[in-house]
Amino acid sequence: TTKTETASKMARRLSRIFTYAVVLRLRTDDPADWKLLSHVLPQKNKIAPIKHREAMEYTDCPALFAQLQENDAASSRALQWIMLSACRSAEGRQMTWDEIDLEKNVWVIAAERTKQRREVRLPITPAMQEIIRWAEPMRRSNYVLTLTDKPLSDVAVSKQLKRYTSRDITVHGLRSSFRTWCQESGVEETLAEMCLTHLVGGNTRNSYARSDMLEQRMGIMTEWANFLKNTNK
């Protein structure tokens, strides 16, 4: 197949099933493990070119953020949260109250909700706390960024974004905008990747193995929030 993204998603799902079967001793191996398949299948970028999602110029992000702040809709608040945290859309939209620790200013996303299937901690900056305070009086369920008992859909958030941007800009592309800001602002590469909850490999990762650098990431994300709100000195 040339639909490599679909194939990758299917392989990940099959791998979870086979892994569970191994735990139950119904199988002895995981035939969908890419470490095995990579010896007989070509890399997906050799089959079809990778299409990167359209990103907004990072210098345009403050203007977008200002427009979103003028809109009190839940989808607007969700987009603000996604921008401030640089999280993935689903992680933000489906965020629950039990994931938030305001005493420690930490947002803990369970492994089953992350792309890498590992628990991650993200700092809650003062700007993000403002969104939490907005949501608290209107709490209807365990989901934070919604006014109903269900999480916002991807369509709802995407529509909100398209009100202020071109059709080609995607919610996921906002993460790329943040990454470019990191590069232009001199943020150390490994820390920038950790802010995006990317797995970092090689010897560089080993130096960070004992810590997720939460305090350092809090500083970076606070600077990013100041940039979005035009409050940088």
Question: What does each model-found stretch correspond to?
Answer:
Residues 3, 10, 17, 55-62, ...:
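Active-site/catalytic core of tyrosine-dependent DNA strand-transfer enzymes
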Residues 5-12, 122, 215-218:
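A generic "alpha-helical surface" signal
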Residues 66-69, 73, 97, 133-137, ...:
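Hydrophobic alpha-helix feature that most strongly marks membrane-spanning transmembrane helices
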Residues 2-15, 23-95, 103, 115, ...:
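Basic, Lys/Arg- and aromatic-enriched nucleic-acid-binding interface segment
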Residues 47, 109-117, 129, 150-151, ...:
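Catalytic-site neighborhood detector that most strongly recognizes the C-terminal catalytic loop/helix
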Residues 18-26, 89, 99, 186, ...:
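A generic secondary-structure signal for well-formed alpha-helical elements
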Residues 34-43, 85, 94-134, 200-206:
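Conserved tyrosine-mediated DNA breakage-rejoining catalytic core shared by Y-recombinases
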